[in-house]
Amino acid sequence: KESAAAKFERQHMDPSMSSASSSNYCNQMMQSRKMTQDRCKPVNTFVHESLADVQAVCFQKNVACKNGQSNCYQSNSAMHITDCRESGNSKYPNCVYKATQAEKHIIVACEGNPYVPVHFDASV
């Protein structure tokens, strides 16, 4: 079974790009990263930074998660991200996404040993 840490990497990490390459980026990535298999995942964020830099966030500013848990952390610096949001004409299995690029601080939930990101909570 896929670990929570591996799932985080599959769903949120794209260090090879500094930003979304094209308007088609989200459609391609959401499909290739298997987030459109049994439904269209409505919103997903990709982080264009090294895995080491994102894992380091687990040792940065401790903040409350949206669900009230206390194991979330905010990055000290802004990171290149792409938000993929399902567009109005999207209907499973033909999931259609709109990309929004930004430079924002990310908030991730961390757990385990080693202590690594397992959930993308927000960007601020």
Curated annotation (Swiss-Prot):
Cystine links in this protein are: C26-C84, C40-C95, C58-C110, C65-C72
Tell me the InterPro entries matching this sequence.
Answer: RNaseA, RNaseA-like_dom_sf, RNaseA_AS, RNaseA_domain
Q: In which tissues is it expressed?
A: Pancreas.
Active-site residues are H12 (proton acceptor), H119 (proton donor)
Q: According to the UniProt record, what class of enzyme is this?
A: lyase
Recorded hits in SUPFAM superfamilies, A to Z, give: RNase A-like (SSF54076)
Basic and acidic residues biased stretches: 1-13
Keywords in UniProt for this one?
A: Disulfide bond, Endonuclease, Hydrolase, Lyase, Nuclease, Secreted
What does it catalyze? an [RNA] containing cytidine + H2O = an [RNA]-3'-cytidine-3'-phosphate + a 5'-hydroxy-ribonucleotide-3'-[RNA]; an [RNA] containing uridine + H2O = an [RNA]-3'-uridine-3'-phosphate + a 5'-hydroxy-ribonucleotide-3'-[RNA]
Region described as Disordered: 1-24
Which GO biological-process labels does this protein carry?
A: defense response to Gram-positive bacterium
Residues engaged in binding substrate: K7, R10, K41, P42, V43, N44, T45, K66, R85
Q: What is its EC number?
A: 4.6.1.18
Q: What is its main location?
A: secreted
Q: MF terms per GO, please?
A: lyase activity; nucleic acid binding; ribonuclease A activity
Cellular component per GO, a single term: extracellular region
The cross-references to Pfam families, in alphabetical order and at most eight, read: RnaseA
Where does the record place it?
Secreted
As for what it does, the entry says: Endonuclease that catalyzes the cleavage of RNA on the 3' side of pyrimidine nucleotides. Acts on single-stranded and double-stranded RNA.
The subunit structure is:
Monomer. Interacts with and forms tight 1:1 complexes with RNH1. Dimerization of two such complexes may occur. Interaction with RNH1 inhibits this protein.
Family as reported in the entry's similarity comment: Belongs to the pancreatic ribonuclease family.
Could you tell me what this protein is called? Answer: Ribonuclease pancreatic
Source species, please? Dama dama
Q: What is the lineage of its organism?
A: Eukaryota, Metazoa, Chordata, Craniata, Vertebrata
